[in-house]
Amino acid sequence: MQLLEERILTDGNILGENILKVDNFLTHQVDYRLMKAIGKVFAQKYAEAGITKVVTIEASGIAPAVYAAEAMDVPMIFAKKHKNITMTEGILTAEVYSFTKQVTSTVSIAGKFLSKEDKVLIIDDFLANGQAAKGLIEIIGQAGAQVVGVGIVIEKSFQDGRRLIEDMGIEVTSLARIKNFENGNLNFLEADA
């Protein structure tokens, strides 16, 4: 997605050897116009897939996921990273390790929001090692629902996340694919949409 790649080049900050900071339009402050455009691209890509739910994980996946859900006219569900006292029964959970934060979290979704009839599109802000997507795939599987695809805003293609998901037989659609970070710059691969 050219608009997204241009925004990354303009406003993204490279930290260290493999961290891209995009807090001024995605991970802290949200550019809703860009998120709306991202949502439309995912909706067009999966228009014929019969998506019934969009699922993400809190927090930075929520903005692109809600706009994708709006464009598809389906509900959006986000997995919670912290135990909530109001979620007391029928909870679907998975362990997710965050390489960025160096912690393992138990993420959860109330089972009443997913059923075996659902066709789910997972949306997330980043794909690196694939652990967040893997955890969501596990949760959706516990409900007996079908994961149709995984939509990613920014993929770090030099890490193993895409391979992990595709090895499960699930399609990955990334709107910006980073080949590498080199001398304080980044290089893109061709995006999926």
Swiss-Prot record:
Subcellular location: Cytoplasm
BP GO terms, sorted: purine ribonucleoside salvage; xanthine metabolic process; XMP salvage
Chain sites annotated for binding xanthine: L20, T27, K156
UniProt keyword Mitochondrion, yes or no: no
Catalysed reactions listed for this entry: XMP + diphosphate = xanthine + 5-phospho-alpha-D-ribose 1-diphosphate
Signal peptide positions (record): none
Pfam families linked: Pribosyltran
EC class: transferase
EC number(s) given by UniProt: 2.4.2.22
Alphabetized SUPFAM superfamilies for the sequence: PRTase-like
Keyword Transferase annotated: yes
Pathway: Purine metabolism; XMP biosynthesis via salvage pathway; XMP from xanthine: step 1/1
Residue positions binding 5-phospho-alpha-D-ribose 1-diphosphate: A128, N129, G130, Q131, A132
Record-level GO cellular component terms: cytoplasm
Summary of the function given for this chain in its UniProt record: Converts the preformed base xanthine, a product of nucleic acid breakdown, to xanthosine 5'-monophosphate (XMP), so it can be reused for RNA or DNA synthesis.
The protein's assembly and partners: Homodimer.
PANTHER family associated with the record: HYPOXANTHINE/GUANINE PHOSPHORIBOSYLTRANSFERASE (PTHR43864), XANTHINE PHOSPHORIBOSYLTRANSFERASE (PTHR43864:SF1)
HAMAP family: XPRTase
Family: Belongs to the purine/pyrimidine phosphoribosyltransferase family. Xpt subfamily.
Protein name: Xanthine phosphoribosyltransferase
Species this protein is from: Streptococcus pyogenes serotype M1
